Amino acid sequence: MERRRITSAARRSYISSGEMMVGGLAPGRRLGPGTRLSLARMPPPLPTRVDFSLAGALNAGFKETRASERAEMMELNDRFASYIEKVRFLEQQNKALAAELNQLRAKEPTKLADVYQAELRELRLRLDQLTANSARLEVERDNLAQDLGTVRQKLQDETNLRLEAENNLAAYRQEADEATLARLDLERKTESLEEEIRFLRKIHEEEVRELQEQLARQQVHVELDMAKPDLTAALKEIRTQYEAMASSNMHEAEEWYRSKFADLTDAAARNAELLRQAKHEANDYRRQLQSLTCDLESLRGTNESLERQMREQEERHAREAASYQEALARLEEEGQSLKDEMARHLQEYQDLLNVKLALDIEIATYRKLLEGEENRITIPVQTFSNLQIRETSLDTKSVSEGHLKRNIVVKTVEMRDGEVIKESKQEHKDVM
């Protein structure tokens, strides 16, 4: 009976942070005590999935870059060839000119040095003139800037004076209006006093007439009742008294009217003088305002020209800033493309490093398994047809201090013509 010992072990393991992946065990799942693992011939690890769309895009970008570089290289080659031809042509011309110069020198001495010295003196003189003109223009510019500051200060002062004059004019106008209102009030009072005087005169005349009528009636009554006594003296005395009283009242009213009229006349004269002064000052302020307005217009024109020059300077600076921004954007794009390419290379390097780490871990695991085996694997080539399945159970113990203790049980099955003849188990301890 032919005996064949079949011992095979194949597994994949990945250890990270105290976790282990064996065979088809999901990543991140821990092995508990008494876990039974079936170790058999496993297929080789599948390659990492590749994003072909990204690879195609990178390949297309690489092709475009290579095409642009090739076109640029061809253009540079053409330019270099044309440059070489031009250099050769200039060298030939230089040789011809050198030969002609030698011929001229051989014929007779020239005065080129004197001609060049004269031209150099002229150029130096022009340079000195331009330097002097530049200095003069700078001085004029500084003077104009100083004059501009002075004019601006003067404009501010004149503006303040104009505002003050306008305020004073408004105050004078208000005073003139008040004087006009006072004059109108005095005129109304004068009219009311004249009406009162006329009313008093009318009342006085009526009183005199009534008194005369009363005297006449009393005289008639006395003449009828008495035997015509002589009342002429009494009537004359009474008439004299009333006339004196009326005359004194009239005189007092006229005096009061005259005093009131004189007061009103003086007030009107004073108000008229104030109004005349206000009008004169208003005319002066108006003339000053016109002159200040002319100065303001001239300064406004100067200010507009300076603002126009400033806008032109700002526009030129804006264009330069825009060009600098565009150059900066291009540089940032190039930097970003370089960063992306570097990130891609780093990702590729990280993937390769992960693959290397996984391979190192698998190699270490295989080495541990092979060291734990007592018997070597001897499988003849012709017995692969009778090869069945070999089961291996793997028991794990507790994990302590970052090391994983495992009991590896190797089960050996002897088969013949598809029938199991003998089974044996061997237990090995392994610490990782």
From Swiss-Prot:
Residue span of region Head: 1-72
UniProt keyword annotations, A-Z: Citrullination, Coiled coil, Cytoplasm, Intermediate filament, Methylation, Phosphoprotein
Which intervals of the chain are annotated as region Linker 1?
105-115
| IF rod domain residues | 69-377
- What Gene Ontology cellular-component terms does the record carry? cell projection; cytoplasm; intermediate filament
Q: Describe the subunit structure.
A: Interacts with SYNM.
The protein, known as: Glial fibrillary acidic protein
Q: Where does this protein come from, organism-wise?
A: Pongo abelii
What broad taxonomic lineage does this protein's source fall under? Eukaryota, Metazoa, Chordata, Craniata, Vertebrata
